[in-house]
A protein has these predicted regions:
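A short, N-terminal "cap"/entry segment at the start of jelly-roll beta-barrel domains
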Residues: 1-43
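Conserved hydrophobic/aromatic beta-strand scaffold that supports enzyme active sites
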Residues: 46-48, 65, 90
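Short acidic-glycine-tyrosine-enriched beta hairpin
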Residues: 79-95
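Conserved short histidine dyad/triad with adjacent acidic residue
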Residues: 40-60, 94-95
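Short, conserved beta-strand element in jelly-roll/cupin
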Residues: 51, 60-75
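A generic "binding-loop/recognition-motif" signal
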Residues: 52, 81, 97, 106-107
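A short hydrophobic beta-strand segment most commonly corresponding to one strand
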Residues: 92, 99, 105-115
Length: 115
């Protein structure tokens, strides 16, 4: 029992990893990602992710559940409607999703990814 069977998600749960989207995917700005990957079990990952303002192309090969904790973003599927996501919103992005993610206000999300 204990830490092996229960874990809080927080920015203190893991060492932060700072990265950026590949330059060829950046549409606007200079988005910087900070990821706290709290758990990795086989094909499952969970933690927290934060991004500064910017816009880049996304292409999902994995399934992801997200809950926006802070900030404001717009996710637009190629050929589809723009979806505004803000603190309190939860959603799933499925494999095959292609489009853009635009961070208007620094955004923090909880995530669970299955590859």
């Amino acid at each position: 029992m204990g830490e092996d069977t229960f874990r809080f998600l927080s920015r203190n749960a893991a060492a932060p990893v700072v990265s950026r989207p590949p330059p060829n995917r950046v549409v606007a700005g200079d988005p910087v990602f900070t990821t706290w990957n709290a758990e990795e079990r086989g094909n499952l990952y969970c933690g927290m992710w934060q991004c500064t303002p910017g816009k880049w192309r996304i292409q999902y090969e994995e399934w992801e559940y997200c809950r926006i904790v802070e900030g404001l973003s717009v996710i637009t599927e190629d050929g589809g409607a723009a979806r505004i996501v803000r603190a309190g919103d939860s959603f799933v992005i499925r494999p095959g999703f292609r489009g853009t993610w635009e961070v208007l206000e620094t955004t923090l999300k909880d995530y669970v990814v299955a590859t």
